[in-house]
Swiss-Prot record:
This protein's encoding gene: PNPLA2
Protein name: Patatin-like phospholipase domain-containing protein 2
Active site (record annotation): S47 (nucleophile), D166 (proton acceptor)
Subcellular location: Lipid droplet; Cell membrane; Cytoplasm
Residue ranges occupied by any PNPLA domain in the UniProt entry: 10-179
Residue numbers on the Extracellular membrane side: 30-42, 159-334
Length: 486
C-alpha cells in the first residue's frame, strides 16, 4: 500500500479514555512495522490521539503511557461523580504523566514530524502545531489539545499567548482526506485501522472528520469516552487495537521480516499459536485480504505487548486483597459511604476549590485580562447585532409615519436665506459644525426609538364619565313665584 519510495502520514483520532486502543495499535506498528513509524512524514493526533502520537514520535515507553491511562481511569472511578468530581483535576493529571514519560529532548524529535490538532478559541478554527521550542511547550500543546470546555475547566489554557481548546472539536482526525494517511480510530467505520463490528447497518455518522458506524457497540464506546469503563474493558480495548493493527499490516503486506512472532531458536519447535498465525497469513494471501483473519489467542497477544503495559493490564484484572479494601467492598460499608455523600461532597469540594485557587494565583492577571477582553467582545457583538436589527426596522417604521410630497413646480416667490433658516430646526441653526449636527441627529434617533416601545395609555378626562342617552331634554322644575320682600 505504501512503498518505501513514497511518503505517508499516520493520524490518531481523539477518543478520550479509549486512547488505550491507540496504545495497542502503536505497539503493534512499532514492533512489527518499525519502518512505517520511522519513515512517516508526519504523525498527527487530536485530543487523546495527540498523547499517543507524542509518545510514538518521541520514543517514549508506550507501556508506561498505557499504564498511566489505566491508572487515571481507576483514579477517576473511585470518586462519586467520576471525572466530574471537584477533586479530580484532569489537566494536572495529564501534565504530570507527560512530565514523567517524555524524555528531555522530546521537543527536538517532535519538531517537524509531530502535528497536534488544536481549536482556536477566538474564531473556532482548527490549528495544527508542528514546531516546539521546549519540552514545556510540547506538554502545553498536548494539554490544550485535550482540554474539553466545562469538562476540564472553564478557562482554556494558552499556548504562545493564544487560547486553545480540544482539537477534536474542529478536526478530530487530521489529514484524513489524503489517500496516503493511515487513519486510526477506536470507533468502527471507514478508518484504516479500526474495530470490525459485525453489523449490517450501513448508516454512518461523521463527527468532525471521524467516520463512526451507527451501531450499538459504537454507542457504547461513545458513552465510555469521557467516563472511563472498568479496567477489564480497557484491557480488551488495548488488545483489540493490537489485533486491528496486525490485521491492517497483513492485509497490506507491511509486516516486517523477519517477523518477531516467528523468530524462534532452531531447536525450539514453533508454538501452536505461531502456526495458526502462519496459516492465517497464508489464507489471507490466497483470499486477497477479503476475509477477516481470525483473532489470535489472548495469551499470544499479551506476550508481545510492551512489558510495562502487560503488567498494567494484569494488575488491572487483579483486585487488592488487603483488609481495608475488603472492608470497603462490603455492602454495609458501601451503603454508609453512599449515605454520607451529601455531607462529604461539600467538604471535598471546598478543599479542592481552595487548592485550585492557590494553584491559579500565578495565572490570575493573565486570565482576568482575557476574561475582560472576551466580555467586551461579546458586548460589542451584541450591540452591533441589536443596532443592525433596529436599523432594518427603523426605515419601514418611518415610511409609515412620514408622508413625502413631490412638488411639481418651484414656488413663484424665491425664499431668502433668512426664510430657509427659519424652516430648519433651532438646533440645526445653532450648530457650529457637522459633528454637532450628527450628534443631535443620533439623539433624535434614540428618542424616536424609545418612543416606538412606549404605549400611550392616557385617557381623556371625559372618557370615564357616564353619559346619558340622547332624548328630549327634561324641563327645569317650576318654582312658585316668591312674594316680594317687605
Amino acid at each position: 500500500m505504501f512503498p518505501k519510495e513514497t511518503t505517508w502520514n499516520i493520524s490518531f483520532a481523539g477518543c478520550g479514555f479509549l486512547g488505550v486502543y491507540h496504545i495497542g495499535v502503536a505497539s503493534c506498528l512499532r514492533e512489527h512495522a518499525p519502518f512505517l513509524v520511522a519513515n512517516a512524514t508526519h504523525i498527527y493526533g487530536a485530543s487523546a490521539g495527540a498523547l499517543t502520537a507524542t509518545a510514538l514520535v518521541t520514543g517514549a515507553c508506550l507501556g508506561e503511557a498505557g499504564a498511566n491511562i489505566i491508572e487515571v481511569s481507576k483514579e477517576a472511578r473511585k470518586r462519586f461523580l467520576g471525572p466530574l468530581h471537584p477533586s479530580f483535576n484532569m489537566v494536572k493529571t495529564i501534565r504530570g504523566c507527560l512530565l514523567k514519560i517524555l524524555p528531555a529532548d522530546c521537543y527536538e524529535c517532535a519538531s517537524g514530524r509531530l502535528g497536534i490538532s488544536l481549536t482556536r478559541v477566538s474564531d473556532g478554527e482548527n490549528v495544527i502545531i508542528t514546531h516546539f521550542n521546549s519540552k514545556e511547550e510540547l506538554i502545553q500543546a498536548n494539554v490544550c489539545s485535550t482540554f474539553i470546555p466545562v469538562y476540564c475547566g472553564l478557562i482554556p489554557p494558552s499556548l504562545q499567548g493564544v487560547r486553545y481548546v480540544d482539537g477534536g472539536i474542529s478536526d478530530n482526525l487530521p489529514l484524513y482526506e489524503l489517500k496516503n494517511t493511515i487513519t486510526v480510530s477506536p470507533f468502527s467505520g471507514e478508518s484504516d485501522i479500526c474495530p470490525q463490528d459485525s453489523s449490517t447497518n450501513i448508516h454512518e455518522l461523521r463527527v468532525t472528520n471521524t467516520s463512526i458506524q451507527f451501531n450499538l457497540r459504537n454507542l457504547y464506546r461513545l458513552s465510555k469516552a469521557l467516563f472511563p469503563p472498568e479496567p477489564l474493558v480497557l484491557r480488551e480495548m488495548c488488545k483489540q487495537g493490537y489485533r486491528d493493527g496486525l490485521r491492517f499490516l497483513r492485509r497490506n503486506g507491511l509486516l516486517n521480516r523477519p517477523n518477531p512472532l516467528l523468530a524462534l531458536p532452531p531447536s525450539q519447535p514453533p508454538a501452536p499459536e505461531d502456526a495458526d498465525a502462519q496459516e492465517g497469513a497464508v489464507a489471507m494471501e490466497r483470499t486477497g485480504g477479503k476475509d477477516h483473519l481470525p483473532p489470535p489467542r489472548e495469551d499470544h497477544i499479551l506476550e508481545h505487548l510492551p512489558s510495562r503495559l502487560n503488567e498494567a493490564l494484569l494488575e488491572a484484572c487483579m483486585e487488592p486483597t488487603d483488609l481495608l479494601t475488603t472492608l470497603s467492598n462490603m455492602l454495609p460499608v458501601r451503603l454508609a459511604m453512599a449515605m454520607m455523600v451529601p455531607y462529604t461532597l461539600p467538604l471535598e469540594s471546598a478543599v479542592s476549590f481552595t487548592i485550585r485557587l492557590l494553584e491559579w494565583l500565578p495565572d490570575v492577571p493573565e486570565d482576568i485580562r482575557w476574561m475582560k477582553e472576551q466580555t467586551g467582545s461579546i458586548c460589542q457583538y451584541l450591540m452591533i447585532r441589536a443596532k443592525r436589527k433596529l436599523g432594518n426596522h427603523l426605515p419601514s417604521r418611518l415610511s409609515g409615519q412620514v408622508v413625502l410630497r413631490r412638488a411639481r413646480s418651484l414656488p413663484s416667490v424665491p425664499l431668502s436665506c433668512a426664510a430657509y433658516s427659519e424652516v430648519l430646526p433651532s438646533w440645526m441653526r445653532n450648530s457650529l459644525s457637522l459633528g454637532d449636527v450628527l450628534a443631535k441627529w443620533e439623539e433624535c434617533q434614540r428618542q424616536l426609538l424609545l418612543g416606538l416601545f412606549c404605549t400611550n395609555v392616557a385617557f381623556p378626562p371625559d372618557a370615564l364619565r357616564m353619559r346619558v342617552p340622547a332624548g328630549p331634554a327634561p324641563e327645569p322644575p317650576q318654582h312658585p313665584p316668591s312674594s316680594p320682600p317687605c
